Amino acid sequence: GLDVEAPTGNMVVDIGGGTTEIAVISLGGIVTNQSIRVAGDVFTSDIQQYMRQQHNIRVGEPTSEEIKIRIGAALPDLDEQPEPFIVRGPNLMTAHPVEIAVTSNEIAHCLDKSLAKIEAAVLQVLEQTPPELYQDIVERGIFLTGGGALIRGLDKRLYEKINIPFHVAEDPLRAVARGTSMALRSTSKYPFLLR
């Protein structure tokens, strides 16, 4: 994990279900942060809307979630393309059952606007970061956690847009919970957690 007590700057982007939390951490505290309501739930909604508009098919939230998990991508033309995902549902015009193969390239296109909002928020936090800590972040990179970190190619897309390396945390779905658990076991080291 990250040494949050070190006098160096670490930046974490946690893309959860309802929000994306972006924070610069140093000396056991948050130096600057931002929270935006663009995260996994918005990605799922984007996919639902895309299927309706581009393929004239109605899909529910569970199917959209499965599409996101199976073939969700932040970049088109990934090195390792997942197999297209077969979506079955009613045609919006005829109500007849239809079957459509959806590709990760399509999902990358459909998530583009939401991912651009996350990029803008990361850049805003970087602008607010003190120069010394900014340099640490450039050298160490930015750490991605949360379920959204599992979107294929997200680290590469963010690197291409922001020009700082991004690293997906080990077990990103549980990284924040594990870190919180460790901190709560050591409340004497982190008294600010009890305020």
Residue ranges and their predicted role:
Residues 60, 64, 79, 182-195:
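Acidic, glycine/GT-rich loop-and beta-edge segments that sit at the periphery of enzyme/chaperone cores
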Residues 156-181, 190-195:
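Conserved phosphate-binding/catalytic loops in two-lobed NTP-binding clefts
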Residues 27-112:
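Phosphate-binding glycine-rich/basic clefts of nucleotide- and phosphate-handling proteins
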Residues 4-32, 79, 152:
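Gly/Thr-rich phosphate-binding beta-strand-loop-beta motif of the actin/hexokinase/Hsp70
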Residues 14, 47, 122, 144, ...:
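Residue-level signature of catalytic and energy-coupling elements of molecular machines
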Residues 110-138, 183-187:
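Phosphate/ATP-binding catalytic cores across multiple sugar-kinase/actin-like superfamilies
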Residues 134-158:
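Glycine-rich phosphate-binding loops at beta-strand->alpha-helix junctions
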Residues 1-13, 181-185, 189:
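Conserved phosphate-binding catalytic cores of ATP/NTP-utilizing and phosphoryl-transfer enzymes
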